[in-house]
UniProtKB/Swiss-Prot annotation:
Residues 265-298, 455-478, 517-533 have a biased composition (Low complexity). Its main location: membrane. Disruption phenotype: Growth defect. Failure to aggregate. Slower migration. Leads to increased F-actin polymerization. Unable to suppress lateral pseudopod formation and turning. Having a direct on PI(3,4,5)P3/PI(3,4)P2 levels. Significant increase in chemoattractant-mediated activation of pkbA and a decrease in chemotaxis speed. Residues 235-298, 410-533 are annotated as: Disordered. It comes from the Eukaryota. This is Phosphatidylinositol 3,4,5-trisphosphate 3-phosphatase and dual-specificity protein phosphatase PTEN. It is a peripheral membrane protein.
């Protein structure tokens, strides 16, 4: 029963199921292992039992393993792994501090160089997203892969059955950042920038924009909350006329939505009329425009600017503007939050919520990699990227971040790696049994990787010389994988998959297992997920 629970919890992740073990664990290379959290007590029933993980590592990699815990939400006594534990914590479904990635890679690098038998065992809670981010960065750090997308696809193929390895857009973006820093030999220095404006374009659906809120954090420290700051916020909406095709009279039949718009328009005209009689409002530097359908639920009118009514909500003001049909200049719908001048540096998280603080979407960016106009598409927004049917956000929805003029010299310092550093970075692909070659940057990737443990105690392979190899051919559309890690569920549903066990310590081999790449091609964030660059 416990084994069934573990398989259910691990979902599409590859498991180590041989030699008496059933662990949420996969060899990404000969010396890099990804696994789920080593758990105790009740949690050990459906996750990796701590005792089984200890026994596995002692049996196959005694004195030659170091465990890396990426969980910020849970820890364990480091003595359980003889004190050989690296701790690089960051929150689930979030990106790490950029400096932490480099520190992690240097730690693994130092450990690997101590002994050729040494392995790194890396885990978060599920052992997939955060774990994959760090492993993909390491694969580029050590020189095994140069391209971000190739590294992500390689990890996805070796860790999962459905090719969904690192799936959180912000985490993918940070793999891209790190890949760029490696390729361009960038010595990272946080850049100070000034955020001026955030634009959501087109307007999100199924939400009253008067309830849209957002906060901006540097790391975990919130530095701006829209609920506590007055802003100049503008909504631009198209005017639409609905015609009854039967009677051809636009006044005969209107949709509920447009009826509400007409009522709102009348209310605005009445408000403008009364205001013009009582007072003339002036343009305020702190305006706020917040309404999805033009409906103002509360507040009072304070004046007009360029023919648009200004409204008061709390301490803020906002304006509404309509775009006439056929307008060729700016003929789209958007909401613009003009923040003014917010100084930022380093890892930035921006989260949009509704009035009940339910998350709409969020994303992480690093100021050293942004453009002056940073455009993040829907596919690059955490949570919003899951809206495949475009119910909450239009298909072309995106976020625009406008920064003040950026000092490119301040962004980072470029250094040329020394001959010794270049040699060290080439150490792993040459010395490892894992060979990774890219025959075409965009078409085919052929990798040979081992998932079977080696008993470093007696320096003997547990398997025959070739039985532990997994050959993966990755194309733009699919991944063909021959792996020694078998999925019993898929074996039942795929009659073409065969498993052969030659002896007790031999790994079963799955021959020519075809796996559709349902994750398509991961977004290569090497250009900061920026469509403007």
């Amino acid at each position: 029963m416990s084994n069934l629970l573990r398989v259910a919890v691990s979902k599409q992740k590859r498991r180590y199921q041989k030699n008496g073990y059933d662990l949420d664990l996969a060899y990404i290379t000969d010396n890099i292992v990804a696994m789920g959290f080593p758990s105790e007590k009740v949690e050990g029933v459906f996750r990796n039992p701590m005792k089984d993980v200890q026994r596995f590592l002692d049996q196959y990699h005694k004195d030659h393993f170091k465990v890396y815990n990426l969980c910020s939400e849970r820890v364990y006594d480091h003595s359980k792994f003889y004190g050989r534990v690296g701790y690089y914590p960051f929150d689930d479904h979030n990106a790490p501090q950029f400096e932490m990635i480099d520190a992690f890679c240097r730690d693994v690098d130092a450990w690997m160089k101590e002994d050729s038998k040494n392995i790194a065992v890396i885990h978060c809670k599920a052992g997939k997203g955060r774990t994959g981010l760090m492993i993909c960065c390491w694969l580029m750090y050590c020189g095994m892969w140069k391209n971000t997308e190739d590294s992500l696809r390689f990890y996805a193929a070796l860790r999962t059955y459905n090719q969904k390895g690192v799936t959180i857009p912000s985490q993918i973006r940070y793999v891209g950042y790190f890949g760029r820093s490696i390729r361009e030999s960038i010595k990272y220095v946080p850049r100070n920038v000034t955020l001026k404006k955030i634009v959501l374009r087109p307007l999100p659906k199924e939400i009253n924009l008067s309830e849209v809120q957002f906060n901006i954090s540097v790391g975990k420290n919130c530095v701006f909350n829209s609920k506590e700051h007055n802003m100049n916020v503008v909504i631009s909406k198209k005017k639409k006329t609905v015609v009854d095709k039967n009677k051809k009279d636009p006044k005969k039949k209107l949709t509920k939505e447009n009826s509400e718009k007409n009522i709102d328009s009348q209310q605005q005209q009445q408000s403008q009329s009364s205001l013009s009689q009582s007072q003339q409002g002036q343009s305020s530097p702190n305006m706020q425009s917040l309404s999805a359908s033009g409906t103002i639920s509360s507040g009072s009118n304070v004046g007009t600017v360029n023919g648009n009514t200004l409204h008061q909500l709390g301490g803020s003001q906002f304006s509404l503007s309509d775009l006439a049909d056929g307008n060729t200049i700016g003929n789209d719908e958007y909401i613009s939050f003009e923040i003014g001048a917010l100084s930022l540096a380093g890892d930035i998280r921006i989260e949009f919520t509704n009035k009940q603080d339910d998350r709409m979407f969020m994303f992480w960016v690093n100021t050293s990699f942004v453009q002056q106009l940073e455009i993040i598409p829907k596919s690059g927004l955490d949570k919003a990227h899951k809206d495949k049917n475009h119910k909450a956000f239009p298909e072309d929805f995106h976020v625009e971040l406008t920064f003040d003029q950026l000092d490119q010299q301040q962004s980072h310092t470029t250094v040329v790696a020394s001959a010794e550093e270049q040699t060290n970075n080439q150490h792993y692909p040459q010395s490892s049994n894992n060979v990774a070659t890219s025959s075409s940057h965009h078409d085919n990737i052929t990798v040979v990787a081992s998932d079977a443990p080696q008993n470093n105690n007696n320096n003997n392979n547990l398997n025959s010389s070739n039985s532990n190899n997994a050959t993966t051919t990755t194309t733009k559309n699919n991944i063909s994988l021959a792996s020694s890690q078998s999925n019993p569920v898929q074996q039942e549903s795929n009659p073409s998959t065969t498993t052969q066990v030659s002896e007790e310590n031999s790994a079963p081999k799955v021959e020519a297992e075809k796996i559709e790449n349902s994750n398509a091609s991961a977004n290569d964030s090497e250009t900061s997920s920026n469509s403007s660059s």
